[in-house]
Amino acid sequence: NQPKQYKHSLIHNDYKYDNVVFSSDSWTKINSILDWEMCTIGDPLMDLGTSIAYWAMASDPKVLKAAFDYPTSLEGNPSRLEVVEMYEKQTGEPVNNLVFYYVFGLFKIAVIVQQIYYRYSKGLTTNEKFKNLNKIAEILCKIGWQSIQKNRIENLF
C-alpha cells in the first residue's frame, strides 16, 4: 500500500519527544526542534509515521514501553490515532495509507536500534541499556507485521 503520489517538504526524519524542547510556560507548545542531522527532502508523512512509531501507549507490550521511555504512555496523552487526527486537523489533509507510514517508521527504528546493538555487541559502546536492543528490533518487526495483517496501528496484540 505504498502511496502512488506524495508531497515533498523538508522532513526532520527523527521527530520524537527527546528531539523537541517544550516551552517553559506550556508543555503543549514546542519552542525548538533538535537533532537535524537526518533531515532531508521527502514525504512529510514519513515524519508522522516515525513519530507514531516511537509513540508508546499504555496498551503496548511492556518491553516496547520500556524501550521508548516517553511520557506518551501516561494517562492524558493522546493515542496514536488521536495524534493522526490532530495532524489532519492542523494540515487540512487526510492521512491516507497510515499503516504504510507507521510500519515504515517501525522498520526505520528497528534498523537504528540494530546499529546501536551491533556497536554494543562489538564493545564499541558499553552502556548497559543497549544490551537488549536486538530484542527491541525483533518486537518492532512483529508490531509492524501485526499492523500490516490487521490494517491498523493500535490494539495489535
Where are these regions (language model features)?
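An alpha-helical support segment within catalytic cores of ATP-dependent transferases
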Residues: 1-13, 17, 23-28, 85-92
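A cross-family kinase active-site recognition segment
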Residues: 1-9, 38-42, 124-137
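Regulatory N- and C-terminal appendages and interdomain linkers associated
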Residues: 111, 115-157
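Catalytic activation segment of kinase domains across protein kinase-like and atypical kinase folds
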Residues: 20-62
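Short, solvent-exposed loop/turn segments at secondary-structure junctions
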Residues: 16-18, 39, 105
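All-alpha amphipathic helical-bundle segments outside canonical DNA-binding/catalytic cores
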Residues: 94-105
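Active-site activation/catalytic loop segments of kinase-like enzymes and analogous catalytic loops
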Residues: 46-91, 105-122
